[in-house]
Amino acid sequence: MKTRTSRLFRLSALAAGLCLAQAALAADPGAAPSYQALPAGNLCPAAAYDSRYNTKYLGFFTHLVQAQDDWLFRTTYDLRTDFGTSAEGWRELRALRDELKRKGIELVVVYQPTRGLVNREKLSPAEKAGFDYELAKKNYLATIARFRQAGIWTPDFSPLFDEKEEHAYYFKGDHHWTPHGARRSAKIVAETLKQVPGFEEIPKKQFESKRVGLLSKLGTFHKAAAQLCGNSYATQYVDRFETEPVGASDSGDLFGDGGNPQIALVGTSNSGPAYNFAGFLEEFSGADILNNAVSGGGFDSSLLAYMTSEEFHKNPPKILIWEFATHYDMAQKSFYRQAMPLVDNGCSGRKTVLSRKVKLRQGRNEVLLNSAALPIRSGSYVADVTYSDPSVHELKNTIWYMNGRREQLKIEQSKAVDTGGRYVFQLRNDSDWADQQFLSLEIEAPEDMPQGLEVQASICQAAPAKASQSVAGR
């Protein structure tokens, strides 16, 4: 009974605070709300057990620990001390960088620092004592060095570590950086951009960023804590910004001179408009940025969608900025199997050895058959598949080989991106698959198949550079 009364008191205080916040916003929409609410209280004991994070959504927060002033941290991601990828992951990443370089594109990776590295002062004394900050810092910097050894331009964010700024880099209870964190990051990234070959030739203009009100955030960590423990948290308010060319408001030329930006940005929701990362990049670099970031698409969806687009192939950027967090797996083989052939636009404009258009029926559909026994060596060929309905975001297919071996491959696209229903991927090029001779391609119809769905599938030879790299990488 005592516990319940205490919780009701906290909720009442929170409700009163929110009412005061609403009144403040009504009086001045651009002002930060002023209210007083009691802290939400400590997390419940269940939050300490990984087994309680038993859904795909909750698994992202394994596991939450209480910090100061309603701050929450995740032990798995925020307090990690290991970074980077496997030896195979580094090889694949280097190969992708080389392919982009061959196309005249310099790759810049924005490898976000963790909350533990930047905001460890917010940890409770016990959690701070248990977090090996020096090891995390050492390994993060070693990973930055590995990116650079792979020929990838990679900013060093260590000047932001252990910050004691008035405006925090991260939100109290959310995995995103605040606009202030985005601004500090963009300033460092812009200094790296200025070192990239070809940057000097990119047209420049002056940009300015202005505060345009407030951004409210009821954080993802706080929402997860509410599911696990029933805790309630106050909404956090921070400054919101927008960036535009100097004089654009007066001239009406809000989008510049109409030229194509020569720097493209792909990445996560951290690069979305709410945090103005792209705008701050424009301000500090003086260059137009084409922002292709996707919210909810992981580290790869926006890059794959951009590489599938007509824009990428007709107007390739001189510099490609790829932003993602440290917890993403850079060794995902399925990602590189798609990204590598997309550099040259799959089978578009290339001679195909097999091609067919089929109206799908329920179940499995044989779409391509190597009936002439053509010498289609798996390690040297690419498949290019396009659904007639772009709303289909999953490809389930089986690739059969002459000796009876088969590969069942499932590729899922984020519903946050539009790739026109197109899927491009390399056939298997592992050492024990590369010499297999292709026999057929079967596609399983989507469960909720649109009426009259058709698929166009082609097989073509990979670019010589790709074929040689796949062999060299083994």
UniProtKB/Swiss-Prot annotation:
Cystine residue pairs: 44-229, 347-460
Reported effect, residue 328 to A: 50% reduction in alginate acetylation
Gene3D superfamilies in the cross-refs: C-terminal carbohydrate-binding module (2.60.120.1380)
CDD domains according to UniProt: AlgX_C, AlgX_N
Lineage: Bacteria, Pseudomonadati, Pseudomonadota, Gammaproteobacteria, Pseudomonadales
Molecular functions per Gene Ontology: acyltransferase activity
The entry's keywords: Acyltransferase, Alginate biosynthesis, Disulfide bond, Periplasm, Signal, Transferase
Chief place of localization: periplasm
Known partners and oligomeric status: Monomer. Interacts with AlgK and MucD.
Record: active site: 174, 176 (proton acceptor), 269 (nucleophile)
Pfam family, one: CBM_26
Homology family: Belongs to the AlgX family.
UniProt name for this protein: Alginate biosynthesis protein AlgX
EC number, UniProt record: 2.3.1.-
